[in-house]
């Protein structure tokens, strides 16, 4: 991943239910190969931390909306992880390691499904390792890879590049030419921009 990459990029953080919804359809919606780039959403300028629910009713309404979208798209029933939001740093370092070994997409999809269809807290390393094992990543290699300074630096660099490209929150699709499309519902607009 370089500053002058020629193809589009899909930015995600595994703690985001919106990114989960988008991830489940990026491959089918975008008309060209798109690089999946894990970022630490909290390092983006306008990231929604999802900690601002005024009450449990607000939280339930949010997840009800996500559940309706998931059901309409034929996804597995939504099971919000407890606690939510969870600390995704370890999971995002594993996603960065997965990117370095060519397993970004299968790992991200498995991890999103663990979190939002399985109701598993991805701040628990064992839950992340289950997702990694589902895409043939050995637990020892994953644990060692996530602990590398170079992996932490790569995640930081990806987050900084995303911010320079105008990514404010996840999910987001950056297209060559500099346009950024934020949110699950913007995938169709990104697809149109990619064929224009």
Language model: regions and residue ranges:
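Structural alpha/beta surface segment adjacent to cysteine/selenocysteine redox centers
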Residues: 14, 18-115
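C-terminal cap of thioredoxin/glutaredoxin-like
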Residues: 4-32, 113-196
């Amino acid at each position: 991943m370089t500053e002058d990459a020629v193809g589009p990029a899909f930015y995600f953080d595994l703690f985001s239910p919106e990114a989960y919804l988008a991830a489940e359809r990026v491959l089918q919606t975008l008309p060209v190969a798109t690089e999946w780039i894990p970022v630490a959403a909290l390092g983006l300028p306008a990231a929604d931390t999802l900690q601002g629910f005024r009450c449990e009713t607000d939280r339930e309404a949010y997840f009800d909306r996500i559940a309706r979208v998931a059901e309409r798209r034929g996804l597995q029933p939504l099971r919000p992880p407890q606690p939510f939001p969870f600390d995704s740093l370890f999971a995002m370092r594993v996603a960065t390691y997965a990117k370095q070994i060519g397993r970004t997409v299968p790992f991200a999809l498995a991890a999103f499904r663990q979190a939002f269809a399985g109701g598993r807290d991805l701040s628990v390393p064992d839950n992340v390792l289950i997702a990694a094992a589902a895409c043939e990543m050995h637990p020892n290699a994953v644990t060692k890879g996530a602990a590398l300074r170079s992996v932490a630096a790569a995640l930081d660099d990806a987050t900084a590049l995303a911010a320079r490209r105008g990514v404010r929150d996840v999910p987001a699709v950056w297209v060559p030419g500099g346009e950024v499309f934020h949110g699950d519902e913007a995938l169709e607009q990104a697809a149109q921009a990619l064929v224009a």
